[in-house]
Amino acid sequence: MMEVEAARVLWRRSVQRHKLRYTTLLSDGDAKTFAELTKIKPYGEDIEIDKEECINHVSKRLGSALRNIVTDCRKRGVTLGGRGKGQLTQNAIRKMTIYYNRAIRGSNSVDSMKKAVMASLHHCFSTDDRPRHELCPTGVDSWCFFQEALAKHQVPGPHDKLVHTPLNEKKLTPHLMPIYKRLSEDQLLSRCVSGKTQNANECLHSLIWARCAKDHFASCKRVQFAVTTAARV
């Protein structure tokens, strides 16, 4: 609740102290702060506060969802993350998370973002016998090795080497598709279009906590000193 209370104070005093309004909240996925600001309406009924998502935190949701589905299926006696070929290994999950982040970061509209997200999944399913690159970007600058080779009038290389062991589409699609559909919904992606992250904020926080550990009590002067010196770095 500390973040909620801090936001309540910052938003309510912004006009009086700084003569400005904070009309956008860059969220890390925690809905409590945004819900509170929507409730108290610090700038009145006519001025709404919009919510945008940190694309790094959104990408982490995919990794968490994939690891959770592996764990849940294991409890039911279904192996998705074993060592066999085409399994949803930790390396595969890391790769898919990177692809998802790149799909969001490299798109400037909800439609293009949605297409890029699904392209990243189909790319991971692709094999020499059944290439699934129809949604991947075309051209010589494409991140997709298959489309890049076609644009250069070359024969694409082997999928086992360039996709790094394609995922078992038949086995994994029923488990992965609901996750990808949920994480490519218009409402979520519309909050990611600006491509913003909380990197700068988290970097500043790490500098502050290095000077004043947040798990120990500190005086007001100590906290002010930590904030001031961190901001000067």
Residue ranges: model-predicted function:
Residues 8, 12-52, 56, 74-233:
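Acidic/histidine-rich catalytic cores and adjacent linkers
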Residues 61-75:
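Short, surface-exposed amphipathic charged segments that create phosphate/polyanion-binding patches used
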Residues 1-7:
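Phosphate/oxyanion-binding active-site loops and adjacent basic polyanion-contact surfaces
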